[in-house]
């Protein structure tokens, strides 16, 4: 076992939510319109991008996952804006002496098209995390009609973060 503290930490996050009629579709703090009026089901606003980034941040520091801090059994978090949750997570990260070096995320969805909203999502995340938007990469892809995303049963997101000790 080493006693040397690392200068960098990497975290990986993943989230998926089911698409349901009657729910809002919010990704990266942006309200999108699904052609079939579908939205993401979840206890909070079910923002898969924000959730995967939170899990990556928490994972990088071995702090568990978002369910530990914002359990679905707690009504306080019902329908909450996930950017609020993300701001709480980044406060925790900074209290431990870490800063974001960069974030890279990929959203997996057949519809709606995500690309037209990427810059707005980056601005929302930049403002919430208090980092330059050049530190944030967001990509979108389809699943070529394979799996739950391909069958439009859900939307998922994978995120990787690099933290640097300050």
Curated annotation (Swiss-Prot):
Originating gene: ispF
Keyword terms, alphabetized: Isoprene biosynthesis, Lyase, Metal-binding
Catalytically driven reaction(s): 4-CDP-2-C-methyl-D-erythritol 2-phosphate = 2-C-methyl-D-erythritol 2,4-cyclic diphosphate + CMP
Role description: Involved in the biosynthesis of isopentenyl diphosphate (IPP) and dimethylallyl diphosphate (DMAPP), two major building blocks of isoprenoid compounds. Catalyzes the conversion of 4-diphosphocytidyl-2-C-methyl-D-erythritol 2-phosphate (CDP-ME2P) to 2-C-methyl-D-erythritol 2,4-cyclodiphosphate (ME-CPP) with a corresponding release of cytidine 5-monophosphate (CMP).
Protein name as catalogued: 2-C-methyl-D-erythritol 2,4-cyclodiphosphate synthase
UniProt xrefs under Pfam families: YgbB (PF02542)
Site annotation Transition state stabilizer: residues: 43, 142
E.C. number(s) listed in UniProt: 4.6.1.12
InterPro entries from the UniProt entry: MECDP_synthase, MECDP_synthase_CS, MECDP_synthase_sf
Pathway(s) the chain acts in: Isoprenoid biosynthesis; isopentenyl diphosphate biosynthesis via DXP pathway; isopentenyl diphosphate from 1-deoxy-D-xylulose 5-phosphate: step 4/6
Family, as annotated: Belongs to the IspF family.
Provenance organism: Prochlorococcus marinus (strain MIT 9215)
Subunit structure: Homotrimer.
BP GO annotations: isopentenyl diphosphate biosynthetic process, methylerythritol 4-phosphate pathway; terpenoid biosynthetic process
GO MF annotations, alphabetized: 2-C-methyl-D-erythritol 2,4-cyclodiphosphate synthase activity; metal ion binding
List of residues binding 4-CDP-2-C-methyl-D-erythritol 2-phosphate: 15-17, 43-44, 65-67, 141-144, 151
Cofactor: how bound: Binds 1 divalent metal cation per subunit.
Native organism taxonomy: Bacteria, Bacillati, Cyanobacteriota, Cyanophyceae, Synechococcales
Annotated PROSITE patterns: ISPF (PS01350)
UniProt-annotated binding residues for a divalent metal cation: 15, 17, 51
Cofactor: a divalent metal cation
Superkingdom: Bacteria
